[in-house]
Amino acid sequence: MIPVFLAAVAAFLPLTSGHIAFWHNSMYGFNVTEQTFPYDNRPVVPLQYMTFQEWWFHNHLDYPPHPGDFFDFPAGKAATAELACNKGATTWFNSSEGGNIQNGNDPCPGSPPSEYHTTGIDDVKGCAMAIAYESDVRKIKPEDFTVFSVNQTCVWYRFTDFQVPERMPPCPPGGCHCAWFWIHSPDSGGEQIYMNGFQCNITGSTSHVPLAKPKVARRCGADPDHGKPDAVPGNCTYGAKQPLYWLQKEGNNEFDDYIAPPFYNDLYNFKDGAQNDIFVDSYPDGIPDPSPEQTIVPTPVNAAAVAAATPAPSSSGSSPSSSSPGSSSTASTTSTSGPRPSARGFRRSTGERPPTGVPTPRKSWTQTRKLRYVCLDRARIVLCCKGLALMVHRLALQRGRHQEPSAQGASLAFLAAG
């Protein structure tokens, strides 16, 4: 009885232990088993020291999903993926070799965390979702993928959320292609990379701003394990970034040492959650070339927030301080150009107190200056003339110039007439 039991356990162990994959029927190689290739090329098998064909899309391009199977990423929301050591630990267990072994949120039922390469939740290094806006998978190149979502608590849970940027544009006809990427901690197991490609779609898209061309990520975060306790923000890659292609025979874009792997976390400026600065208009002032000596840290512009905060122009032809229909009083206040006129200035020009919270259009400096010297009625005209005559008389006396008796008398007579 014991030998039979041990044989059953031995047959079961390869299916429940070791490594992790993204599981969904939209993925390439969804039904690949240990016997499909001359070598073990199941989706959970890690990738290291391989040729480009062997590691790119896990060499599963000849095992595509059904044309209509897509994984949906809702713009501005979270998409929940299933990460597990075996398909039987997911909701797709009915097509697995070992049947249903689900155990709640456990990514690797019956196995310790070392099977998914971590010593604990404090030792996880993050994973990423990347997208290529191309429906023909054969046309996609490594530099076409852009990381758009990162979960730094990965791998730890079977159900893993990936926040999607709100401004993700829609996919082309035929959909997009995405890929899940992971590089684990060096504290538990040998180093590798993980990649599972799949058909995907962006749902609920309201923006058509394209993604920027992704660049290679750079090591810039605090790295105390390798003698660098402080981050170097100037050395970071900002904006759209490529996935980390590392430790292969060819096709690498990262060349870190085996004992210092790259990660999808702050070490390479992959912030947790949606990567909201990956669009062509995210950095209107440009991005400086990264280097350890660079001191300028660019700040992305949240174009969506700016657009929402900008009031729509009024169609009534009113002044710039007028708000559009439906705008709040706050929006009207903030859209007024220049400072508000003081209460004193308001009363002087209208004779009334200014309504609370309502700005008064301020005259330009030139216009105000002109009005100071315009007399609006006959009495003021007389007063102005008297003032001018008195000014002329005083200037004449100061300069020692003598007017003709008739002119001087006329001036004095005009002053006396008042």
UniProtKB/Swiss-Prot annotation:
Residues 307-364 are annotated as: Disordered. Its EC number is 1.14.99.-. Residues 307-343 have a biased composition (Low complexity). It is found in: Secreted. Disulfide bonds join C85-C108, C127-C154, C171-C176, C178-C200, C220-C236. Keywords: Copper, Disulfide bond, Glycoprotein, Metal-binding, Monooxygenase, Oxidoreductase, Secreted, Signal. Pfam families: LPMO_AA14 (PF22810). InterPro entries: LPMO_AA14 (IPR054497). GO terms for molecular function: metal ion binding; monooxygenase activity. The unique enzyme activity of AA14 family LPMOs involved in the degradation of woody biomass in nature offers an innovative solution for improving enzyme cocktails for biorefinery applications. One of its GO terms (cellular component) is extracellular region. Binds 1 copper ion per subunit. Its cofactor is Cu(2+). The keyword Hydrolase does not apply. Belongs to the polysaccharide monooxygenase AA14 family. Lytic polysaccharide monooxygenase (LPMO) that oxidatively cleaves xylan with both C1 and C4 regioselectivity and that specifically targets the protective shield made by heteroxylans that cover cellulose microfibrils in wood. Catalysis by LPMOs requires the reduction of the active-site copper from Cu(II) to Cu(I) by a reducing agent and H(2)O(2) or O(2) as a cosubstrate. Cleavage occurs only when xylans are bound to cellulose and not when they are in solution. This is AA14 family lytic polysaccharide monooxygenase B. It comes from Trametes coccinea (strain BRFM310).
